[in-house]
Amino acid sequence: LCNLLAGYITHPNVAGATVLSLGCQKAQIAMLKQAVASKDPQGLRPVHYLEQQASTSEDALIEQALGTIFDGLREANQVTRQPAPLSALRIGVECGGSDGFSGLSANPVVGGVIDRLVALGGSGILSEFPELCGVEHELLSRCVDDATAERFSSLMRAYQRHADAVGASFSMNPSPGNIRDGLITDAMKSAGAAKKGGDSPVVEVLDYTETATRPG
């Protein structure tokens, strides 16, 4: 959880954060601070941590939180946009409300954009791991080395085990809306979902909350 929250806090589109903590939960402030520091070692992102159980009252906590938020907004509004190379751009791709045309039109267009970005030195992240069930061979053939391919296979097997443990399966993936709009099988949905990743080589496989470290 702390790694997930730290990812949100250190996202390039986030100027800063005010974190409200109860004080006795498992995800302690110290743990979140450590996770944020690992993703932002230079401390470029202002983060304010407030603990309810250390505050004199709930009203005082809310007042303090609002103060830090509005102070942060004033500071963020002074920031001006600066030019940046496309090699610094990282885009994560996600399906919208998928229908029978997603794999024919929308997703291939998204994949084409990702291929162009990668060719220019940027990075694309193909999300929704479970939706790739049934098209693993397509991704495996694009992995740059055996270690990357094995990690992909290992994570797919792990997702399958998690699904089995709760009495679910990847075949249950298509929603009623998907089926109504033409995606009648999980294989069709998976084939379309993979199109978002284009045809570029797979250089890295990430587990949940992990951060990309390589361009591509």
Task: Label the predicted regions.
Residues 1-216:
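Metallocofactor- and cofactor-centric catalytic cores in central/energy metabolism, strongly enriched
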